[in-house]
């Protein structure tokens, strides 16, 4: 047995132990870092404090949004809470106006004192009712002569009329009303349209 044989035996043994063939270089396994190294207690506290601050800021933002929404709802309730009642009262105003319109002008001029007092009483009641409505934010729409607006007017018919621009309200059938900036009841109107030109 020579020294070369000893060296050969030693290298063969080392190769077998390493699981590789003789003459191949030996490769060691790389060190792999753990995926989630353990946090130190101070890092955990900092992370927990940041999460708590984030939750607190979100809660404060939600509370502020809730406060603003509640204020809007309260303001709307104050402004529009009487809408249903006001709509019912408008029928009374319409009936008072119909009663006044039912008396012809000639009958008013030649009326006896009893009829004159009745007409004045109905007019006074109508004015009083409109004042009460205005006091509560309900305003009358004066539609006659205005440009037709589908947001506040409801067209019932068209009237051929070249004396005004097409799309102008020429007749009001039923008065419209607003409550705040909302339409309580649209005005029922007749709208002008251009008269057809005669055929030549």
Swiss-Prot record:
Against HAMAP family, the record matches this protein to: GrpE
| NCBIfam families assigned | PRK14140.1, PRK14141.1
What keywords does the record list, in alphabetical order? Chaperone, Cytoplasm, Stress response
InterPro entries recorded: GrpE, GrpE_coiled_coil, GrpE_head
Q: Where are the transmembrane segments?
A: none
Any one GO CC term of this protein is:
cytoplasm
* UniProt-annotated location(s): Cytoplasm
Q: What does this protein do?
A: Participates actively in the response to hyperosmotic and heat shock by preventing the aggregation of stress-denatured proteins, in association with DnaK and GrpE. It is the nucleotide exchange factor for DnaK and may function as a thermosensor. Unfolded proteins bind initially to DnaJ; upon interaction with the DnaJ-bound protein, DnaK hydrolyzes its bound ATP, resulting in the formation of a stable complex. GrpE releases ADP from DnaK; ATP binding to DnaK triggers the release of the substrate protein, thus completing the reaction cycle.
UniProt-annotated stretches for the region Disordered: 1-43
Statement: the UniProt record of this protein carries the keyword Signal: no
Where composition is biased (Basic and acidic residues), the residues are 1-11
Q: Read off the lineage from the record.
A: Bacteria, Pseudomonadati, Pseudomonadota, Alphaproteobacteria, Hyphomicrobiales
Q: How does this protein assemble?
A: Homodimer.
GO biological process assignments: protein folding
Give the domain of life: Bacteria
Q: What is this protein called?
A: Protein GrpE
Q: Identify the PANTHER family for this entry.
A: GRPE PROTEIN, GRPE PROTEIN HOMOLOG, MITOCHONDRIAL
Q: Which Gene3D superfamilies is this protein grouped with? A: 3.90.20.20, Head domain of nucleotide exchange factor GrpE (2.30.22.10)
The record's principal subcellular location, in a coarse class, is cytoplasm
Q: List the molecular function annotations (GO) for this entry.
A: adenyl-nucleotide exchange factor activity; protein homodimerization activity; protein-folding chaperone binding; unfolded protein binding
């Amino acid at each position: 047995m020579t020294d070369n044989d000893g060296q050969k035996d030693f290298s063969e043994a080392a190769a077998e132990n390493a699981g590789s063939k003789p003459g191949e270089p030996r490769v060691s396994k790389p060190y792999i870092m753990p995926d989630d190294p353990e946090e130190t207690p101070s890092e955990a506290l900092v992370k927990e404090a940041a999460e708590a601050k984030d939750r607190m800021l979100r809660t404060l933002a939600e509370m502020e949004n809730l406060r603003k929404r509640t204020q809007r709802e309260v303001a709307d309730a104050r402004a529009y809470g009487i809408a249903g009642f006001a709509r019912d009262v408008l029928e009374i105003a319409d009936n008072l106006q119909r009663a006044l319109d039912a008396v012809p002008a000639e009958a008013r001029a030649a009326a006896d004192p009893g009829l004159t007092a009745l007409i004045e009483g109905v007019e006074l009641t109508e004015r009083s009712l409109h004042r009460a409505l205005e006091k509560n934010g309900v305003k009358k729409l004066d539609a006659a002569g205005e440009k037709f607006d589908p947001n506040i007017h409801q067209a019932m018919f068209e009237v051929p009329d070249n004396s005004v621009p097409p799309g102008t309200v020429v007749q009001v059938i039923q008065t419209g009303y607003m409550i705040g900036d909302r339409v309580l009841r649209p005005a029922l109107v007749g709208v002008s349209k251009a008269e057809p030109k005669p055929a030549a």
